[in-house]
Swiss-Prot record:
Changes after translation: Contains an active site 4-methylidene-imidazol-5-one (MIO), which is formed autocatalytically by cyclization and dehydration of residues Ala-Ser-Gly.
Organism lineage string: Bacteria, Pseudomonadati, Pseudomonadota, Alphaproteobacteria, Hyphomicrobiales
SUPFAM superfamilies (UniProt xref): L-aspartase-like (SSF48557)
Main location: cytoplasm
Pfam entry (one): Lyase_aromatic
GO molecular function: histidine ammonia-lyase activity
Protein name: Histidine ammonia-lyase
GO cellular component: cytoplasm
Amino acid sequence: MTIILKPGSVPLETLEKIYREGLPVRIDPAFHAGIEKAAARIAEIAAGDAPVYGINTGFGKLASIRIAAGDVATLQRNLILSHCCGVGEPLSENIVRLIMALKLVSLGRGASGVRLEVITLIEAMLEKGVIPMIPEKGSVGASGDLAPLAHMTAAMIGEGEAFYRGERLSGAKALGKAGLKPVVLAAKEGLALINGTQTSTALALAGLFRAHRAARTALITGALSTDAAMGSDAPFHEEIHQLRGHKGQIDAGRALRTLLEGSAIRRSHLEGDQRVQDPYCIRCQPQVDGACLDILRQAARTLEIEANAVTDNPLVLSDGRAVSGGNFHAEPVAFAADQIALAVCEIGAISQRRIALLVDPSLSFGLPAFLARKPGLNSGLMIAEVTSAALMSENKQMAHPASVDSTPTSANQEDHVSMACHGARRLLQMTANLNAIIGIEALTGALGVELRKPLTTSAELAKVIAALRAKVATLEEDRYMADDLKAAAELVADGTLSGVISAGILPDLEA
């Protein structure tokens, strides 16, 4: 299946399919005429006498140096090779595929001036599985993601490296094995390919998709913990959240209420319970998780706009002029990444407190210490809770805003930058930590519910426990725990736990 992209209106749902499923993509042929028109205009400018940045001049601080017509192709090649300055491990294939798809969307708007053959090469590389090797570090998020995108482009011109069928090869070899030929870049094409926010945006989108799946699962594990602790569902009453009015809070409260519907555990203490209120980690879930959901949705709106944006420079305007601007500055992406980081941090923080509550016999309302069946002889989930605390603390450190840390570069020509790229890249580690925290809460909550037998939980939560137990057996006595934690985190990450919940209960990203 090939996804047909309509530049300017590609929805988040499609972008997530590209990220998760690695499907090939093509630009809707209806956009080809506009692409070719802009390319023809760039060719006219390159043949003329007037200096235009990036077409017949140097770059950055060297923009005042005029380039002879005969050197334009060399200029573009030199640009790519000199900007291949990335360091660190290669970005994963699914991230690079998303970067390439986003670059297609941007170029497909017909304001960049690249020839159609450049676009068709990217499409063919995605279809045949030629994935450029892009090091993870080296971008400050303005002027675009220069170093990462230069590595992408290097493979297109037969330089650099690329992965093909599991092999890491030279760019030329990878293209050759796939039956493709490198492109010779014409005027402005190198600049159009490397000057853009696609790396930062792809990383931020990946973080968003992972964070949203984790957020949905955290509502499930939060409901499990509530039932395991014999907590009250009264704070989830619809009217409470309507009176405040925040959409995320309303949606989170509704989800928690529905997940707990029909629980025999809850019915057992409706009357005669001497506890007046639950701790905040139980009672305030809608307020905390709902606020996180709201900012994830806000970040989603920003990133959907950016994914459809033209972010190189200069741009070919509708009147035919090539005009320099600053769309390459990734400040919106940096802010979105910082928002996602805050949400990831807080979802993990309140989840960790519920884990701590359930393993503490002074708080868990009758559950054994650390949920061990023979406390003392067995330590139960004692150190699983400690691990969740370590991961929570690590995420707190990584949640510091990246967008506030500008520094001047390129001889002060590029004197304010966004730091969007590493701000977005940290989300991969943060969401991995969050998946592990929520996985530990799933283990804790499920075991707590099982220890309430013969009382039973709701039908929805019973499905979650069954999905967990298909991979992780109930803890009867101490055993090697690392495999349990790994399996539980994977069930969060791959959507297994959220996937068993009936449609319409868990909140969507687009609301």
